[in-house]
């Protein structure tokens, strides 16, 4: 499911490639620079920051309006949270029930311990059909395992049919938002991408939204009508009936789920609901939280195989890929409640400034900051002696709590962030840490009256470094660690203790 907002990105320079790609990583859950480095790069792109602010504000406002229409919204959130808690508590039994239900209705269930197993299963199914192309419904699970790249190694092209995902794929880029994967692209870039990478794009294509959508529609229509295998993700799966559900906004999913002869669905094991009637709760929570709509334009549900109607071969791949490890963590398992609505991204002040690519994972934003490190686990040091880039993700937050306030299933993201931070700090004990070193220096100065007085005098001299607004903008190292990202207020020329001594009688009781 995606919403194409078409907000602009910065205009490329004349000597730049019109759509500079961000190549697909070898590890979709751990790639690129650590967050502090990537965030610094993103912060330098002021146009990107303005565009993200405009886009997230639009989605936030839409969500607020439709949520206000629901008098029992908080009760719905409680219900969604309770269902998800039940799923995690009974997950083994519910998965067995789902397998039984799907199998009884003509489907085939596969179990994948990790990305490699899942990719091998899907590649085996696809190559057995003798096809060299498949169509795909938008799926974060398949992005997580790098399925498109795995299929390419077997000579199979996976065509993304969601408009925004198609844009990202044609540009050899990475998505930067759950629902608006191409939020960092503007219309001019999209036109250039289509002309350069879409073989059947009209040569006179302009950047008018209607023309862009029409070109994509014609391109995809031919794929829908000729491709024999489709691959999808799943928003939900009802254990009692074996029914799988996909919600989307464009209709491409409906085409993929009905026209091809074979359908392969890759689903994280946490996407279960115990009963079909539980979908009532989530089909109210998800569209309002995600796209600010009262209901999804397209809600597709299918149960196994129906003779003469739709795909005649259905495979369900149940993906673990670190989820059972997260489930075993009492403090962090609530991250598996996530229904991928992206509401937390749209309210996060950090995401709004740096965008999705800075997180180095297909799961950006607040939920990505708690889910990605748990899925991948600590890796010690990466190649070249650098620390695992995911270790910094729990610190990519102001802990303002806005994500918790909007989460439709009440995931306490701030609390999990704090827990993951504590673990990272504990793992770092004994290493030279700038923050710890600064605290030791402060403790040394504050533990002795004479040293503290001397420190006050030194600090008072720095007021001369400030400008007319009494702010310091540049300091030498180690002060540059602060001033490279924010201004520093100058200390008062007179300390509080000196002011008190000058204005109060020492004999006067305080």
Model-predicted segments: where are they?
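Short, contiguous, pocket-lining structural segments
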Residues: 271, 336-340
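Short coil/turn segments at secondary-structure boundaries
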Residues: 164, 294-298, 432-437, 470-476
């Amino acid at each position: 499911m995606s919403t194409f907002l078409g907000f602009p990105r910065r205009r490329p320079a004349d000597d730049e490639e019109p759509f500079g790609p961000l190549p697909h990583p070898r590890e979709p859950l751990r790639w690129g620079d650590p967050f502090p480095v990537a965030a610094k790069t993103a912060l330098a792109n002021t146009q990107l920051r303005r565009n993200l602010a405009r886009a997230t504000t639009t989605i936030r406002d839409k969500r607020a309006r439709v949520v206000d229409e629901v008098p029992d919204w908080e009760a719905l959130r409680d219900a969604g949270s309770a269902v998800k808690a039940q799923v995690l508590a009974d997950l083994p039994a519910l998965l067995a029930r789902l397998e039984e239900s799907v199998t009884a209705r003509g489907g085939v269930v596969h179990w994948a311990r990790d990305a490699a197993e899942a990719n091998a299963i899907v590649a085996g199914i696809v190559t057995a059909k003798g096809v060299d192309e498949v169509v795909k419904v938008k799926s974060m699970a398949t992005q997580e395992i790098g399925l498109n790249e795995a299929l390419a190694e077997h000579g199979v092209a996976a065509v993304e049919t969601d408009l925004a995902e198609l844009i990202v794929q044609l540009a050899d880029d990475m998505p930067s938002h759950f629902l608006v994967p191409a939020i960092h692209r503007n219309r001019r870039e999209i036109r250039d991408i289509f002309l350069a990478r879409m073989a059947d794009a009209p040569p006179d294509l302009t950047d008018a939204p209607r023309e862009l959508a029409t070109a994509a529609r014609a391109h995809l229509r031919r794929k829908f009508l000729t491709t024999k295998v489709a691959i999808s993700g799943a928003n939900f799966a009802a254990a009692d009936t074996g029914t799988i559900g996909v919600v989307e906004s464009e209709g491409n999913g409906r085409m993929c789920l009905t026209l091809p002869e074979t359908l392969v669905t890759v689903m994280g094991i946490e996407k279960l609901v115990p009963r079909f009637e539980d979908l009532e709760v989530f089909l109210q929570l998800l569209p309002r939280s995600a796209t600010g709509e009262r209901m999804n334009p397209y809600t597709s549900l299918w149960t196994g195989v129906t003779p003469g109607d739709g795909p005649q071969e259905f495979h369900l791949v149940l993906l673990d890929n670190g989820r059972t490890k997260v489930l075993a963590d009492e403090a962090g398992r609530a991250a598996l409640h996530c229904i991928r609505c992206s509401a937390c991204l749209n309210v996060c002040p950090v995401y709004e400034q740096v965008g999705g690519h800075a997180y180095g994972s297909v799961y950006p934003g607040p939920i990505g900051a708690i889910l990605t490190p748990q899925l991948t686990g600590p890796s010690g040091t990466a190649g070249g002696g650098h620390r695992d880039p995911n270790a910094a993700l729990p610190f990519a937050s102001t802990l303002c709590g806005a994500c918790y306030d909007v989460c439709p299933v009440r995931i306490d993201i701030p609390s999990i962030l704090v827990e993951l931070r504590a673990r990272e700090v504990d793992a770092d004990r004994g290493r030279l840490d700038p923050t710890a070193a600064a605290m030791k220096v402060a403790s040394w100065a504050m533990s002795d009256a004479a040293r503290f007085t001397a420190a006050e005098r030194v600090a008072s001299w720095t007021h001369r470094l400030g400008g007319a607004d009494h702010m310091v903008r540049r300091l030498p190292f180690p002060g540059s660690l602060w001033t490279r990202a924010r201004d520093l207020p100058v200390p008062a020329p007179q300390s509080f203790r000196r002011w008190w001594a000058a204005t109060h009688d020492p004999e006067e009781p305080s």
